[in-house]
Every structure is written in C-alpha cells, then in structure tokens.
C-alpha cells in the first residue's frame, strides 16, 4: 500500500440499498487520484465485484452512447442483494480523460467508431491501468471473487491478485450504442 492513502468508511444509503463507501487516494508522479469503493458491510469470501471506470456522461448524465451507466446500476442492484463491492476507478473515457473523451465523441458524431476516434486524437483504444484495483483487493483481503464484467482485460488484470470467476453483465443495446457495443465485441474482444 505504498502509493495509497485510505479514508475512513462512511455509510451510503442509495436507491439500490445500504452501502458503505471508502476512498483510496492513489499517489503518483503526476499528482493524486481518488478512487471510490462502494460495498455491502459483510460481503462473503467470494463476493461479487464490479471494476468500473468512471464515465461521467453515462454514470451521471444517463448517456445512451455507451453501456456504462446501465452496467453500474445493474452491478449496484445485484451487489446490494448478493453482497460485494464496486471499485470505481477515476479513469474517464477508457483512461483518456473527460476533455479528450468529448473530442473523441465529436469524431464519433462524424462516423468514426470509438477506437478510431481515440487513435485520431493520439491515444490507444484503452489507456486504463488496473493495478490500483489489485492493491484495493489486497486491502480488503479478497482472494476469490465473482467479477461482473465482459472485458477480458479486466479479468486478466485481476487474476494476478485473486481467483476470478466471470459473471456477465449485459446492458441492452439501443439505437445510440449498438455500434459501440459491436466495436467492443469485435475489435476489443469483449464477451458480449
């Protein structure tokens, strides 16, 4: 835990149920970044885990261009019933940040897919780093989990820290995100 500062725990009542929250401040050469863990008080030794990267447009604004907000809501609903945690990483736009994400959205409006748009503004298809999530899992002493994901990169990253069983999390396609979901499946290998 050399690069993490950990906050106190607090209660968080939500529309999905009662949770606790705890913040993890990641310290790095370019400053600090705060990540949030939302969890049920007494989760099992094989909890449901959702590793979720921040998506302001989907999570807070209800964007239909992606499946992020729906995936987060589905995860919170399941976790409130079955026990577990959401590790909410501050990695907006698959790690490119909000400013660059909006620029990528503008390119998508012109017909480019999500990967092409990222590459056109100088980024890889996915710039995220999940190692901080591994440190968070170690903090909670999680050695085995049921990971709510369709992303094989998340599975591979977390298998370094714990035994992972994948549970799918399918958000229905709509007219705005159908192409995005197809790109995630065909070009990024998502298990949709």
Curated annotation (Swiss-Prot):
Cofactor note: Binds 1 zinc ion per subunit.
Residues where Zn(2+) binds: 55, 66, 68
This protein's GO CC annotations: cytosol
Matching InterPro entries: GTP_cyclohydro_II, RibA, RibA-like_sf
Keyword terms of this UniProt record: GTP-binding, Hydrolase, Metal-binding, Nucleotide-binding, Riboflavin biosynthesis, Zinc
Active site residues according to the UniProt entry: 126 (proton acceptor), 128 (nucleophile)
Catalytic activity entry: GTP + 4 H2O = 2,5-diamino-6-hydroxy-4-(5-phosphoribosylamino)-pyrimidine + formate + 2 phosphate + 3 H(+)
GO MF terms held by the record: GTP binding; GTP cyclohydrolase II activity; zinc ion binding
A biological process term (GO) from this entry: riboflavin biosynthetic process
Residues given in the record as GTP binding sites: 50-54, 92-94, 114, 149, 154
Pathway given in the UniProt record: Cofactor biosynthesis; riboflavin biosynthesis; 5-amino-6-(D-ribitylamino)uracil from GTP: step 1/4
Names of required cofactors: Zn(2+)
Domain of life, source organism: Bacteria
Uppermost EC category: hydrolase
Listed EC numbers: 3.5.4.25
Family to which the UniProt record says this protein belongs: Belongs to the GTP cyclohydrolase II family.
Function as written in the Swiss-Prot or TrEMBL entry: Catalyzes the conversion of GTP to 2,5-diamino-6-ribosylamino-4(3H)-pyrimidinone 5'-phosphate (DARP), formate and pyrophosphate.
Name of the molecule in the record: GTP cyclohydrolase-2
Lineage: Bacteria, Pseudomonadati, Campylobacterota, Epsilonproteobacteria, Campylobacterales
